[in-house]
Amino acid sequence: MVNLRNAVHSFLVHLIGLLVWQCDISVSPVAAIVTDIFNTSDGGRFKFPDGVQNWPALSIVVIIIMTIGGNILVIMAVSMEKKLHNATNYFLMSLAIADMLVGLLVMPLSLLAILYDYVWPLPRYLCPVWISLDVLFSTASIMHLCAISLDRYVAIRNPIEHSRFNSRTKAIMKIAIVWAISIGVSVPIPVIGLRDERKVFVNNTTCVLNDPNFVLIGSFVAFFIPLTIMVITYCLTIYVLRRQALMLLHGHTEEPPGLSLDFLKCCKRNTAEEENSANPNQDQNARRRKKKERRPRGTMQAINNERKASKVLGIVFFVFLIMWCPFFITNILSVLCEKSCNQKLMEKLLNVFVWIGYVCSGINPLVYTLFNKIYRRAFSNYLRCNYKVEKKPPVRQIPRVAATALSGRELNVNIYRHTNEPVIEKASDNEPGIEMQVENLELPVNPSSVVSERISSV
């Protein structure tokens, strides 16, 4: 209690000094608290060099807050919005958890190291733990993006096979595998660091991974290999989407073998259609023209939706690539050219590039906000403290008919304006399938006009 009281007193004193004597301050409030609580043996309180202020550190605090807050919004959106309940968004929520933990556990300690001029101010046993968390969450980010890329490619390439194994439980299992791989990559660091402090300290003061073999192997396993898989699968996904769109535009479709369910198709029945049935040539031409006109409608919309989703994910992939590649490339070069390279320059570059990678954790929520209406609307509601889930209007269901009673025959379900009750009639034998005829009850139309909906009987 005495140490805590002294720490609070020290914080208030230095905060007043920061507000009143900004130009003369020599100790930051955060540094004062840490020094008073831990009473480290590294010596005294931190002092900025002459002429240097702590405003860059304050800007980093803003980045940390935005990273934590933005990823919390993503987690809330996926948890509360039913439209976002799918495998890809579950992966994005898990990715947001990793990014949020970067803002909570990794970035503040890195900021603390900057305040102390990269002299580790905390107990030394915490250094390998902090490095392990850094590697864990960074690896989890790239593994999540790699898993998303693979999952979407399989879903677009083999939709039927993917739908059989695509459920919430399966998505959670895949996410668990991603986290298991990330933990497996990061666990050796505390073991190595606690056995030999030289593996995690440079010049016995700076907390940084100092094992060349682990740096090389870890960089390839945790970054370059998943990055290669991610780029290849994303390019293949774009190729498949373009090929499917071109085939639809030219009137060709790829139908998987076996049974398939047709989408609900609506058309108006008129007397001209019955007249054309008497002429086989005209009837055949009409069917071809009708089939060609209505084929792309639902499928093209699905492909457009996939393109939009792929565009958003592509931006996320590109941002991650641009912001983390400099760090890992410099990290590899610092090991390969240990003697020929300027190590001081390499250390300065790594200190800058690692923060560029950290900023990537806070950019993803901005990407979702700019390019996805559902996320944008959800974020807007949450920021206004509106957490109500939209309820869909009740849907009136038509009584179901047992499949065994159909036997390939057609049933006409007519809902008339004056009764609002369905009347089921058996149709003729020469028109197989199921036909539901529902009169429009809302719009002022001719009572004789009936909308016909045909569903394939499988």
From Swiss-Prot:
Annotated transmembrane regions: 56-80, 87-111, 129-151, 168-189, 214-236, 312-336, 348-370
Residue ranges of the motif PDZ-binding: 456-458
Subcellular location as annotated: Cell membrane
SUPFAM superfamilies: Family A G protein-coupled receptor-like
UniProt record, GO biological process: behavioral fear response; chemical synaptic transmission; feeding behavior; G protein-coupled receptor signaling pathway, coupled to cyclic nucleotide second messenger; locomotory behavior; phospholipase C-activating G protein-coupled receptor signaling pathway; phospholipase C-activating serotonin receptor signaling pathway; regulation of appetite
Parts of the chain on the Extracellular side: 33-55, 112-128, 190-213, 337-347
Pfam families: 7tm_1
Motif (NPxxY motif): 364-368
Residue ranges, annotated region (Disordered): 274-301
Broad class of where this protein is predominantly found: membrane
Biased composition (Basic residues): 287-297
Keyword presence, Membrane: yes
Superkingdom to which the source organism belongs: Eukaryota
GO CC annotation, single: dendrite
Topology in membrane: Multi-pass membrane protein
Cleaved signal peptide residues: 1-32
Subunit structure: Interacts with MPDZ. Interacts with ARRB2. Interacts with MPP3; this interaction stabilizes the receptor at the plasma membrane and prevents the desensitization of the HTR2C receptor-mediated calcium response.
Family: Belongs to the G-protein coupled receptor 1 family.
Official protein name in the record: 5-hydroxytryptamine receptor 2C
Organism: Pan troglodytes
